[in-house]
Amino acid sequence: MTTNMLPLHPYWPRHLRLDNFVPNDLPTWHILVGLFSFSGVLIVITWLLSSRVSVVPLGTGRRLALCWFAVCTFIHLVIEGWFSFYHEILLEDQAFLSQLWKEYSKGDSRYILSDGFIVCMESVTACLWGPLSLWVVIAFLRHQPFRFVLQLVVSVGQIYGDVLYFLTELRDGFQHGELGHPLYFWFYFVIMNAIWLVIPGILVFDAIKHLTNAQSMLDNKVMKIKSKHN
C-alpha cells in the first residue's frame, strides 16, 4: 500500500495494513443497543433477585452494588472471555461479539492487533474477575462472612488493570485511536473505562469501612475478655 492511498479500515495508526479486515455488517447503533439492552435486562433481573433471594434484607446501595457485579460477570466472562479466545480472528469474524470488539477497536486498535499486554490483561480479567464477580453476588445474597473481602479483591484488581490499561496507552502517545474523537476516544476509550475506576474505587472504600468496623468489634471483644480474666 503506497503512502498516498487511503487505508481500507477505520483504525489508527492510519498506516496499519490489515489484509484480513472485514467491515462490520451491523451498524454501530445496533451493536451498542444490543450491548446496553442486555446489560439493562441483567440489572433489572439482579435488582429483583436481590430482594427475593437474599437471606437478609439488603439496602438500596447494596442492591445496586450487586447489579454492578452482575454486569461485571457478564462483561468479564462473556465479552472479554470472547476476546481472549478469538482475538486472533476478530478482523475477519462476523459474530456479534467480534463485531462489538471491532467497533470498540476504533477507539483502541490494540484489540484488533492482539497487543501482548491487552491479551494478557483481558485473559486475566476473564479468568479471575469474571468468576469472582459472580461469587461476590452469591456471597452477598447468602450473607457469607467473606463477602467484603471478595468485594475488595475484585475491585482492587479492576482498578489495577484499568490503571495499567490507561498508562500503557499514554506511554504509547495515544496512537491507537483518533485523539479527541467524541465517540471513539471520549466515550469508548475514556468514559467506558473510567467507570472501572470510579465504581470500584467507591466499593474499595466501602469494603475497607466494613472490614475495619468488623476488626474493631473483634478487637473490643478480645479486650473485654482479657479484662475479665485479669
Swiss-Prot record:
Catalysed reactions listed for this entry: lathosterol = 5alpha-cholest-8-en-3beta-ol; zymosterol = 5alpha-cholesta-7,24-dien-3beta-ol; 5,6alpha-epoxy-5alpha-cholestan-3beta-ol + H2O = 5alpha-cholestane-3beta,5,6beta-triol; 5,6beta-epoxy-5beta-cholestan-3beta-ol + H2O = 5alpha-cholestane-3beta,5,6beta-triol
Keywords: Acetylation, Cholesterol biosynthesis, Cholesterol metabolism, Cytoplasmic vesicle, Endoplasmic reticulum, Hydrolase, Isomerase, Lipid biosynthesis, Lipid metabolism, Membrane, Nucleus, Steroid biosynthesis, Steroid metabolism, Sterol biosynthesis, Sterol metabolism, Transmembrane, Transmembrane helix
Gene Ontology molecular function: any one: identical protein binding
Pathway terms, separated by semicolons: Steroid biosynthesis; cholesterol biosynthesis
InterPro entries listed in its UniProt record: EBP, EXPERA
UniProt lineage: Eukaryota, Metazoa, Chordata, Craniata, Vertebrata
Topology versus the membrane: Multi-pass membrane protein
Biological role: Isomerase that catalyzes the conversion of Delta(8)-sterols to their corresponding Delta(7)-isomers.
Transmembrane residue ranges: 29-49, 66-86, 121-141, 185-205
Organism listed in the record: Rattus norvegicus
Main location: endoplasmic reticulum
Protein name according to UniProt: 3-beta-hydroxysteroid-Delta(8),Delta(7)-isomerase
PANTHER family assigned to the protein according to its UniProt record, in alphabetical order: 3-BETA-HYDROXYSTEROID-DELTA(8),DELTA(7)-ISOMERASE (PTHR14207:SF0), STEROL ISOMERASE (PTHR14207)
Protein's UniProt keywords contain Repressor: no
EC number annotated for this UniProt entry: 5.3.3.5, 3.3.2.11
Gene Ontology terms: biological process: cholesterol biosynthetic process; cholesterol metabolic process; hemopoiesis; ossification involved in bone maturation; sterol biosynthetic process
Positions where N-acetylthreonine occurs in the chain: T2
PROSITE patterns, sorted: EXPERA
Entry similarity comment: Belongs to the EBP family.
Regulation: Enzymatic activity is induced by 25-hydroxycholesterol, cholestyramine and lovastatin.
Domain EXPERA: 61-204
Other noteworthy facts: Binds to the phenylalkylamine calcium-ion antagonist emopamil, an anti-ischemic drug.
Subcellular location: Endoplasmic reticulum membrane; Nucleus envelope; Cytoplasmic vesicle
Entry GO CC: cytoplasmic vesicle; endoplasmic reticulum; endoplasmic reticulum membrane; nuclear envelope; nuclear membrane
